[in-house]
Amino acid sequence: MKTIGMLAGMSWESTSLYYQLINREVQARLGGVHSAKALMYSFDFAEIAALQNAGRWDEATVALSDVGRMLAGGGADFLMICCNTMHLMAEAVERAAGIPLLHIADPLGAAIKARGLRRVGLVGSCFTMEKGGIVIDRLRARFGIETIVPEADERAEIQRIIIEELCRGRFLDSARATHRGVFERLVARGAEGIVLGCTEIPILVGPEDASVPTFDTTTLHALAAVEMALR
Protein backbone atom coordinates (compact mmCIF):
# COMPACT_ATOMS: atom_id res chain seq x y z
CA MET A 1 0.00 0.00 0.00
CA LYS A 2 1.30 3.45 -0.93
CA THR A 3 1.38 6.27 1.60
CA ILE A 4 -0.97 9.18 0.90
CA GLY A 5 0.27 12.70 1.63
CA MET A 6 -2.73 14.84 2.56
CA LEU A 7 -2.61 18.65 2.44
CA ALA A 8 -5.58 19.17 4.71
CA GLY A 9 -7.40 21.44 7.16
CA MET A 10 -9.04 23.55 4.43
CA SER A 11 -11.36 23.26 6.31
CA TRP A 12 -11.14 20.61 9.02
CA GLU A 13 -14.86 19.85 8.55
CA SER A 14 -14.19 18.31 5.15
CA THR A 15 -10.82 16.88 6.21
CA SER A 16 -12.59 14.74 8.82
CA LEU A 17 -14.86 13.45 6.04
CA TYR A 18 -11.87 12.71 3.79
CA TYR A 19 -10.22 10.72 6.58
CA GLN A 20 -13.35 8.67 7.23
CA LEU A 21 -14.00 8.00 3.54
CA ILE A 22 -10.43 6.91 2.83
CA ASN A 23 -10.14 4.60 5.82
CA ARG A 24 -13.58 3.06 5.38
CA GLU A 25 -12.79 2.29 1.74
CA VAL A 26 -9.43 0.72 2.61
CA GLN A 27 -11.10 -1.43 5.25
CA ALA A 28 -13.89 -2.40 2.85
CA ARG A 29 -11.38 -3.50 0.23
CA LEU A 30 -8.80 -5.20 2.45
CA GLY A 31 -10.97 -6.35 5.35
CA GLY A 32 -10.02 -6.88 8.96
CA VAL A 33 -8.60 -3.88 10.75
CA HIS A 34 -6.77 -2.47 7.73
CA SER A 35 -6.55 1.31 7.43
CA ALA A 36 -4.85 3.76 5.11
CA LYS A 37 -1.19 4.65 5.29
CA ALA A 38 -1.25 8.43 5.33
CA LEU A 39 0.67 11.52 6.32
CA MET A 40 -1.46 14.60 6.95
CA TYR A 41 -0.56 18.25 7.36
CA SER A 42 -3.49 20.28 8.62
CA PHE A 43 -3.28 23.99 7.83
CA ASP A 44 -4.78 26.68 10.02
CA PHE A 45 -7.52 27.55 7.56
CA ALA A 46 -7.82 31.11 8.86
CA GLU A 47 -4.33 31.77 7.48
CA ILE A 48 -5.16 30.21 4.11
CA ALA A 49 -8.49 32.06 3.87
CA ALA A 50 -6.73 35.36 4.59
CA LEU A 51 -4.34 34.74 1.69
CA GLN A 52 -7.24 33.82 -0.60
CA ASN A 53 -9.27 36.90 0.28
CA ALA A 54 -6.26 39.18 -0.19
CA GLY A 55 -5.43 37.63 -3.57
CA ARG A 56 -2.01 36.58 -2.26
CA TRP A 57 -1.94 33.41 -4.31
CA ASP A 58 1.84 33.42 -4.69
CA GLU A 59 2.22 33.20 -0.92
CA ALA A 60 -0.38 30.46 -0.75
CA THR A 61 1.53 28.57 -3.43
CA VAL A 62 4.72 28.80 -1.40
CA ALA A 63 2.93 27.59 1.73
CA LEU A 64 1.42 24.54 0.02
CA SER A 65 4.61 23.77 -1.90
CA ASP A 66 6.62 23.76 1.33
CA VAL A 67 4.18 21.31 2.87
CA GLY A 68 4.20 19.15 -0.26
CA ARG A 69 7.98 18.87 0.00
CA MET A 70 7.70 18.07 3.70
CA LEU A 71 5.20 15.27 3.10
CA ALA A 72 7.31 13.85 0.27
CA GLY A 73 10.35 13.94 2.54
CA GLY A 74 8.37 12.17 5.24
CA GLY A 75 7.61 9.23 2.98
CA ALA A 76 4.45 10.10 1.07
CA ASP A 77 4.24 8.35 -2.30
CA PHE A 78 1.74 10.82 -3.75
CA LEU A 79 -0.14 13.94 -2.67
CA MET A 80 -3.72 15.10 -2.53
CA ILE A 81 -4.92 18.62 -1.77
CA CYS A 82 -8.09 18.20 0.29
CA CYS A 83 -9.72 21.37 -1.04
CA ASN A 84 -11.04 22.31 -4.48
CA THR A 85 -9.93 25.95 -4.38
CA MET A 86 -6.30 25.24 -3.59
CA HIS A 87 -5.93 23.18 -6.75
CA LEU A 88 -5.17 26.55 -8.31
CA MET A 89 -1.56 25.77 -7.38
CA ALA A 90 -1.71 21.99 -7.85
CA GLU A 91 0.90 21.88 -10.62
CA ALA A 92 3.32 24.05 -8.62
CA VAL A 93 2.93 21.83 -5.55
CA GLU A 94 3.52 18.70 -7.61
CA ARG A 95 6.68 20.17 -9.13
CA ALA A 96 7.99 21.29 -5.75
CA ALA A 97 7.34 17.94 -4.08
CA GLY A 98 8.69 15.81 -6.90
CA ILE A 99 6.01 13.15 -6.46
CA PRO A 100 2.63 12.69 -8.19
CA LEU A 101 -0.38 14.74 -7.13
CA LEU A 102 -3.90 13.35 -7.53
CA HIS A 103 -5.87 16.26 -8.99
CA ILE A 104 -9.45 16.55 -7.74
CA ALA A 105 -10.78 17.29 -11.25
CA ASP A 106 -9.58 13.98 -12.71
CA PRO A 107 -11.85 11.53 -10.84
CA LEU A 108 -14.60 14.13 -11.20
CA GLY A 109 -14.20 14.30 -14.96
CA ALA A 110 -14.09 10.52 -15.23
CA ALA A 111 -17.33 10.20 -13.23
CA ILE A 112 -19.13 12.80 -15.34
CA LYS A 113 -17.93 11.19 -18.57
CA ALA A 114 -19.03 7.75 -17.33
CA ARG A 115 -22.57 9.11 -17.03
CA GLY A 116 -22.41 10.40 -20.61
CA LEU A 117 -22.86 14.04 -19.61
CA ARG A 118 -21.30 16.98 -21.45
CA ARG A 119 -22.54 20.07 -19.56
CA VAL A 120 -22.57 20.44 -15.78
CA GLY A 121 -23.28 23.16 -13.26
CA LEU A 122 -20.50 23.91 -10.79
CA VAL A 123 -21.18 25.08 -7.24
CA GLY A 124 -18.24 25.84 -4.96
CA SER A 125 -16.24 28.69 -3.50
CA CYS A 126 -16.28 31.94 -5.46
CA PHE A 127 -12.68 31.20 -6.46
CA THR A 128 -13.51 27.74 -7.82
CA MET A 129 -16.50 29.10 -9.73
CA GLU A 130 -14.67 32.13 -11.14
CA LYS A 131 -11.07 30.96 -11.70
CA GLY A 132 -10.95 28.53 -14.61
CA GLY A 133 -7.58 27.11 -13.60
CA ILE A 134 -8.97 25.21 -10.62
CA VAL A 135 -11.49 22.79 -12.16
CA ILE A 136 -13.25 24.33 -15.18
CA ASP A 137 -10.33 24.40 -17.63
CA ARG A 138 -9.20 20.89 -16.75
CA LEU A 139 -12.68 19.44 -17.25
CA ARG A 140 -12.83 21.05 -20.69
CA ALA A 141 -9.30 20.17 -21.80
CA ARG A 142 -9.13 16.59 -20.53
CA PHE A 143 -12.74 15.44 -20.71
CA GLY A 144 -14.54 17.76 -23.13
CA ILE A 145 -16.97 18.82 -20.41
CA GLU A 146 -18.53 22.29 -20.42
CA THR A 147 -19.15 23.97 -17.07
CA ILE A 148 -21.66 26.65 -16.16
CA VAL A 149 -21.73 28.53 -12.85
CA PRO A 150 -24.40 30.38 -10.87
CA GLU A 151 -25.09 34.08 -11.35
CA ALA A 152 -22.92 36.64 -9.52
CA ASP A 153 -25.33 37.22 -6.62
CA GLU A 154 -25.74 33.47 -6.15
CA ARG A 155 -21.98 32.96 -6.16
CA ALA A 156 -21.60 35.59 -3.44
CA GLU A 157 -24.25 33.93 -1.27
CA ILE A 158 -22.70 30.48 -1.72
CA GLN A 159 -19.32 31.88 -0.69
CA ARG A 160 -20.89 33.47 2.40
CA ILE A 161 -22.50 30.17 3.36
CA ILE A 162 -19.24 28.25 2.92
CA ILE A 163 -17.16 30.60 5.08
CA GLU A 164 -19.70 31.76 7.66
CA GLU A 165 -21.57 28.49 8.08
CA LEU A 166 -20.12 25.29 6.60
CA CYS A 167 -16.51 25.87 7.63
CA ARG A 168 -17.79 26.55 11.16
CA GLY A 169 -19.79 23.35 11.37
CA ARG A 170 -23.19 24.98 10.77
CA PHE A 171 -25.31 23.07 8.27
CA LEU A 172 -28.63 24.90 8.15
CA ASP A 173 -31.91 24.20 6.36
CA SER A 174 -31.80 27.72 4.93
CA ALA A 175 -28.45 26.99 3.26
CA ARG A 176 -29.77 23.71 1.93
CA ALA A 177 -32.77 25.50 0.44
CA THR A 178 -30.49 28.10 -1.15
CA HIS A 179 -28.40 25.40 -2.80
CA ARG A 180 -31.48 23.55 -4.05
CA GLY A 181 -32.70 26.73 -5.73
CA VAL A 182 -29.31 27.32 -7.33
CA PHE A 183 -29.23 23.74 -8.62
CA GLU A 184 -32.61 24.06 -10.30
CA ARG A 185 -31.69 27.35 -11.95
CA LEU A 186 -28.52 25.74 -13.32
CA VAL A 187 -30.61 22.86 -14.66
CA ALA A 188 -32.95 25.38 -16.32
CA ARG A 189 -29.87 26.83 -18.05
CA GLY A 190 -28.90 23.44 -19.44
CA ALA A 191 -26.88 21.70 -16.72
CA GLU A 192 -27.15 17.92 -17.05
CA GLY A 193 -25.51 17.36 -13.67
CA ILE A 194 -24.36 19.34 -10.64
CA VAL A 195 -20.79 19.36 -9.33
CA LEU A 196 -20.54 19.80 -5.56
CA GLY A 197 -17.26 21.61 -6.01
CA CYS A 198 -16.42 22.63 -2.48
CA THR A 199 -15.37 19.87 -0.11
CA GLU A 200 -17.81 21.11 2.57
CA ILE A 201 -20.89 21.25 0.33
CA PRO A 202 -21.47 17.44 0.23
CA ILE A 203 -21.94 17.57 4.01
CA LEU A 204 -24.87 19.96 3.42
CA VAL A 205 -26.58 18.54 0.32
CA GLY A 206 -26.67 15.32 -1.65
CA PRO A 207 -28.29 13.55 -4.60
CA GLU A 208 -31.76 14.01 -3.13
CA ASP A 209 -31.40 17.79 -3.39
CA ALA A 210 -31.14 17.97 -7.20
CA SER A 211 -33.24 16.76 -10.12
CA VAL A 212 -30.13 15.70 -12.05
CA PRO A 213 -27.08 13.62 -11.03
CA THR A 214 -24.76 15.22 -8.48
CA PHE A 215 -21.00 14.74 -8.34
CA ASP A 216 -19.45 14.88 -4.87
CA THR A 217 -15.84 15.94 -5.37
CA THR A 218 -14.88 14.99 -1.81
CA THR A 219 -16.00 11.38 -2.13
CA LEU A 220 -14.70 10.99 -5.68
CA HIS A 221 -11.29 12.37 -4.66
CA ALA A 222 -11.09 10.20 -1.54
CA LEU A 223 -12.00 7.00 -3.38
CA ALA A 224 -9.53 7.79 -6.17
CA ALA A 225 -6.82 8.22 -3.54
CA VAL A 226 -7.53 4.74 -2.20
CA GLU A 227 -7.44 3.33 -5.73
CA MET A 228 -4.06 5.00 -6.30
CA ALA A 229 -2.73 3.80 -2.94
CA LEU A 230 -3.68 0.19 -3.58
CA ARG A 231 -2.50 0.05 -7.21
Where are these regions (language model features)?
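Non-catalytic structural scaffold of enzyme domains
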Residues: 1-231
